[in-house]
């Protein structure tokens, strides 16, 4: 049995065959031959193509954020006809934690920031405030994250030391109180630092 394709179907088939080999070909095609499914196909294979679009729909923008959250930057800076929503921000940050840097200030909240920090603790360095209780929990799970906390204080560090001494090698300085907590909760570990009151890492 033979299926006779109309002209548009044949053209679309040729387009699909071409973009499988090179998704960037989509930029050379007339808009009437490129529907949303073709754009999604291309963006999925090469997320950088998204910012080269002229007039993406909200659906395409949401899809682009799900493929690579950093595409939120292009929606914010270039495609200003698109309304950025809470769902779009969540989708972007879930896909790529660095997307938190492009979330509009009015839509930033602690839950969204902490989801980003869970994926990439270094992002804390871009924010002046992070919830102390979150920092305390994160430092137990990822001691190296102490490098990126901007609002760090002695109380938080002491609580982290109580839970695990593994944070100590990442501290530039240990106060007498920190050493005391280390001695009380992890005496074996304390022996490594008891004669170094000024700094663990110079």
Feature locations, PLM:
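Alpha-helical scaffold segments
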Residues: 1-202
């Amino acid at each position: 049995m033979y299926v006779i394709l109309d002209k548009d179907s044949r053209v679309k088939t040729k387009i699909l065959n071409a973009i499988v080999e090179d998704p960037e070909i989509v930029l050379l095609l007339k808009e009437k031959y490129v529907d949303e499914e073709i754009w999604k196909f291309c963006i999925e294979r090469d997320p950088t193509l998204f910012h080269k679009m002229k007039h993406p729909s909200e659906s395409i923008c949401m899809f682009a954020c799900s493929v690579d959250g950093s595409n939120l930057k292009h929606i914010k800076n270039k495609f200003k006809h698109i309304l950025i929503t809470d769902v779009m921000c969540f989708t972007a940050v879930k896909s790529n934690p660095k997307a938190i840097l492009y979330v509009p200030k009015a839509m930033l909240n602690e839950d969204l920031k902490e989801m980003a920090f869970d994926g990439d603790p270094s992002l804390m360095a871009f924010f002046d405030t992070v919830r102390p209780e979150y920092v305390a929990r994160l430092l137990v799970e990822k001691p190296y994250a102490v490098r990126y906390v901007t609002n760090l204080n002695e109380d938080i560090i002491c609580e982290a030391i109580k839970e695990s001494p593994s944070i100590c090698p990442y501290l530039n300085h240990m106060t007498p109180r920190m050493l005391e907590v280390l001695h009380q909760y992890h005496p074996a570990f304390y022996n490594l630092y008891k004669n170094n009151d000024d700094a663990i890492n110079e």
